[in-house]
From Swiss-Prot:
GO terms for cellular component: SAGA complex. Coiled coil: none annotated. Belongs to the SPT20 family. It comes from Gallus gallus (Chicken). Keywords: Developmental protein, Gastrulation. Pfam families: Spt20_SEP (PF12090). GO terms for molecular function: transcription coregulator activity. This is Transcription factor SPT20 homolog. GO terms for biological process: gastrulation; regulation of transcription by RNA polymerase II. Residues 423-502, 666-687 are annotated as: Disordered.
């Protein structure tokens, strides 16, 4: 279809150019008299055969003026006067003198609209029929427009003349039919229809019924060339500065302002009172002035030193929105926004992914282009970029939507697919898990240097110690996958004197262990998320959120594995329900029990009979002890904040300090140090 239309346009251009250069001659009947249209065509052929006096100019223009001058045809004269004098109509009498019949103001522009459309006004048909001179030519009227508005001398005004051919409208033809059939003869309805058809055939232009697109294209091109400056927007602009519009503006200016717009009236009067600012500018004649800036050469020397801090602009890093509290998500959040638009004949899709990784309060994003309907068409993994808070994420989606609409310049459809909470692991009751490797992103910072590296996978120990109730951690039950969802944070610039190295590990997923060996009937699906953050004081803050309903929560750090058995108290584990009373902490009970747990390197678990509860753990790094009294510096401290621990912990019991010495507990200083540490790291309860 597109190719056929282009061919039709080319054909139309060829036909117009051929008719302009070599118009074909027509054959007429010798008996009949030529109509005004035939006379115009013969004049057109005659002018085309003549050579133009000036090159690149055409002679086959202004044919109606030339025809009137050759045959002295009678015309309807329309005078356009300047100012508020309006316009008038004149008819020529038998003696050759023109008499003015109608004079109207420019506000009554109905007749002018008919003249602009080159149509015969029906209201003038009766007046023109009573004229002394026959003014009709094949049903048409030749009108001469005399424009006096451009004349500067009003005493002897001159005018610009232009001729137009006014064709009868259907309303004028109906009036002619009624005037003809209003005599004494009896006209039937069939006779009236036959008369109307003959009038239409006599006044209508030649009709081409060729079913070719080139005919329509040719007609449209000719009409466009004729009506270039006569479009509706151009008419609207012309009317804005017409005399009638200017008169209306002057009348409105003299009216008093209504009471509601007194301020506008005051501002207009104040604006009129202010005179234009006078500038005393004297322009010298050419050649009398000398441009001094052209005479004096300009030498610029490069400065030896540049104050960079004076001109440099410091861009602050992205900070989370303070209006929204920092939320540590317990699960991954992923939202996909697919933008679909049709550019040309191709469907383009772009996917914007906004996601929040496990244990990271910041939002990240990535953009990828989908080549087909399936989202798997994009094989390349797009790079992710930092967005910030949730408000920033919404702003990014809105800005990207506006960007796609502005570039596509067409309607854009947006599809939102919310991934919601993505469960990290699903275990059916009684199902054993296969051991998996744990990969971590470790950032080591030395004083003055920061090195990022990825260590080899760390295997979870299959078994650590034994208990009276049996080996509760079998290789099939130990499972966990730790990974870094976000890039590690940059190393700090300053460190305490006693701190030589700090390790921070981002743990993304930690699976729950199903106690199949203990009570297979009570196991269910478990989900746990862990986040480890670096503390400036050399402590690692671990945020654990998980469902600990009668099962074991596995936590991993630089210490030996910590675990707990739900049913028995043995050297292999610690039952927190027996350690923590309802009234508060029992610091004296920690060291003796923790000694056996540290020596055996056994896991330690947490029991909770309630539903999902968050858990915060603060873990200290190794530091060199200065003396034996400072037992905390030689040990690794872990503070667990159990928020809303349900059955076995009251709201006033805020924290429990578990001290696992790297060389074992045996001195009395360990007990006192553990009591002081547990009191020092107490945190308020989170509701």
């Amino acid at each position: 279809m597109q190719q056929a239309l282009e061919q039709a346009l080319d054909r139309a251009e060829y036909i117009i150019e051929s008719a302009r250069q070599r118009p074909p001659k027509r054959k007429y009947l010798s008996s009949g008299r030529k109509s005004v249209f035939q006379k115009l065509y013969d004049l057109y052929i005659e002018e085309c055969e003549k050579e133009p006096e000036i090159k690149k100019l055409r002679r086959n223009v202004n044919l109606l003026e030339k025809l009137v001058m050759q045959e002295t045809l009678s015309c309807l004269v329309v005078n356009l006067y300047p100012g508020n004098e309006g316009y008038s109509l004149m008819l020529r009498g038998k003696n050759g003198s023109d008499s003015e019949t109608i004079r109207l103001p420019y506000e009554e522009g109905e007749l002018l609209e008919y003249l602009d459309a080159e149509e015969l006004p029906p209201i003038l048909v009766d007046l023109l029929e009573k004229s002394q001179v026959n003014i009709f030519h094949c049903g048409c009227v030749i009108a001469e427009i005399r424009d006096y508005r451009q004349s500067g001398n009003m005493k002897s005004p001159t005018y610009q003349s232009k001729h137009i051919l006014l064709r009868p409208t259907m309303q004028a033809l109906i009036c002619d039919v009624h005037s003809i059939t209003s005599d004494n003869h009896k006209w039937t309805q069939e006779d009236k229809l036959l008369l109307e058809s003959q009038l239409i055939l006599a006044t209508a232009e030649p009709l081409c019924l060729d079913p070719s697109i080139a005919v329509t294209c040719t007609t449209n091109r000719l009409l466009y060339n004729k009506q270039k400056m006569n479009t509706r927007p151009m008419k609207r602009c012309f009317k804005r500065y017409s005399k009638s519009s200017l008169n209306r503006q002057q009348e409105v200016a003299h009216y008093s302002t209504p009471p509601q717009l007194r301020l506008v009236d005051y501002l207009q009067k104040r604006k009129g009172k202010k005179g234009a600012q006078q500038y005393d500018l004297k322009i010298s004649k050419a050649g009398n002035c000398v441009d001094m800036w052209k005479q004096n050469p300009c030498y610029l020397t490069a400065p030896s030193e540049v104050d960079v801090e004076k001109y440099a602009k410091v861009e602050s890093s992205i900070k989370p929105d303070d209006s929204q509290p920092t939320v540590w998500p317990a699960h991954e959040v992923k939202d996909d926004y697919v933008f679909e638009c049709e550019v040309g004949n191709q469907l383009q899709k772009t996917k914007l992914t906004i996601f929040q990784s496990l244990g990271n309060p910041l939002y990240y994003g990535k953009i990828q282009t989908l080549k087909g309907d399936d989202e798997s068409d994009s094989l390349l993994v797009p790079p992710q970029f930092l967005i910030g808070s949730k408000t920033d994420a919404e702003r990014v989606v809105n800005q990207y939507h506006e960007l796609v609409k502005s570039e596509a310049k067409c309607p854009v459809k947006m599809f939102h697919n919310s991934g919601g909470s993505i469960n990290l692991s699903h275990l059916s009751p009684g199902k054993e898990m296969e051991p998996e490797s744990i990969s971590g992103s470790v950032q080591s910072s030395v004083l003055g240097k920061g090195v990022k590296h990825r260590p080899p996978p760390i295997k979870l120990p299959s078994s650590s110690g034994s208990s009276s109730s049996g080996n509760i951690f079998s290789p099939q039950q130990s499972s966990g996958h730790l990974k870094s969802p976000t890039p590690p944070p940059p190393p700090p610039t300053s460190k305490p004197p006693g701190l030589s190295r700090k390790q921070s590990m981002d743990l993304n997923q930690v699976s729950m262990l199903s106690p199949a060996a203990m009570s297979p009937a009570s196991s269910s699906q478990r989900t746990t998320s862990t986040q480890v953050m670096a503390n400036p004081a050399g402590l690692n803050f671990i945020n654990v959120v998980g469902s600990v309903c009668g099962a074991q929560t596995l936590m991993s750090g630089s210490n030996p594995m910590l675990g707990c058995n739900t049913g028995a108290i043995a050297p292999a584990g610690i039952n927190l329900s027996g350690i923590l009373p309802s009234g508060g902490l029992v610091p004296s009970a920690l060291p003796a029990t923790m000694q056996s747990a540290s020596q055996a390197g056994s896991p330690f678990g947490l029991k909770n009979a309630s539903n999902l509860r968050p858990l915060n753990l603060l873990q200290g790094s190794d530091q060199g002890p200065s003396n034996q009294d400072q037992a905390l510096s030689a040990q690794q401290a872990a503070v667990i904040n159990l928020t809303g621990v349900g059955n076995f912990m009251q709201p006033q019991a805020t924290a429990v300090a578990i001290l696992a010495a790297s060389n074992g507990y045996g001195s009395s200083s360990s007990t006192s140090s553990s009591s002081a540490t547990s009191a020092a790291f107490r945190q308020p309860l989170k509701k």
